[in-house]
A protein has these predicted regions:
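Acyl-donor binding region in acyl/amide transferases
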Residues: 33-68, 72-208
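Conserved N-terminal entry element of GNAT/NAT acetyltransferase domains
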Residues: 6-40
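Short, charged, solvent-exposed linker or helix-capping segments at domain edges/interfaces
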Residues: 210-214
Length: 214
């Protein structure tokens, strides 16, 4: 029988992450807005604590190849992002790309999922979400190549309309291509039921559909 690997609890801080102070009303007024790629133990703990305390889906675990970022400013920690493996099958995404089943299996690693995106609930700063999205999309392909030896060409993300309208994705020039089928990532037998979500895509390379179908 296959041995089950025990899951360990995520590393956390001993107290909540401090709230940012004196944050301006618009992202353009933040002088030192940075994305920090999570690497050190301290950064892992901050990211986990933020997600566990403030993101509706918690810290994970994320699936497959992954890169995580913290959003830092001179005012404090503003949130975080996590990129991980894409959905195995996604009808509207696969149709937009033009995939058949064999090509999808061969090229699926070139698509990554923005599986966590948190602007802290206490942060109210105009255009911050779309600005941070843009910053992450400019560095994530390089960071994936540095860590895993290949470049992703497309990012997908899911938006639950009961919680969000997708405005920040639209402002950052993502493309809405349809809806998910309301099943989990590994639900091959149609047994799970989760809310259907809007699917947004963002190309990280030119001619992305042709590349993914080659």
């Amino acid at each position: 029988t296959r041995r089950q690997t025990p899951q360990t609890d995520p590393r956390r801080l001993t107290k909540p992450v401090e709230e940012p102070l004196n944050l301006p009303s618009a992202a353009g007024k933040i002088q030192e807005l940075q994305l920090i790629r999570v690497q050190t133990d301290a950064e892992v703990r901050i990211w986990n604590e933020l997600m566990i305390q403030e993101h509706p889906r918690g810290a994970g675990p994320l699936v497959g190849a992954q890169i995580r970022y913290l959003i830092r400013s001179e005012h404090g920690w503003l949130g975080g992002l996590g990129f991980s493996a894409s959905a195995l099958q996604l009808k509207d995404r696969d149709r937009w790309i033009g995939w058949d089943a064999q090509t999808r299996r061969q090229q699926l690693h070139r698509v990554i999922n923005l599986s966590r995106f948190l602007i802290r609930p206490s942060v109210h700063c105009h255009n911050l979400a779309s600005r941070v999205l843009g910053m992450s999309l400019r560095c994530v392909a390089d960071d994936f190549e540095l860590r895993y030896g290949y470049r992703p060409w497309l990012v997908e993300s899911f938006v639950d309309q009961s919680r969000h309208t997708g405005t920040c994705y639209q402002a950052a020039n993502w493309r809405r291509v349809g809806q998910s089928a309301g099943r989990g990532r590994n639900d091959r037998h149609h047994r799970l039921s989760v809310p259907a979500k809007d699917i947004y895509l963002y190309p990280l390379a030119r001619n992305v559909q042709r590349r993914l179908c080659d």
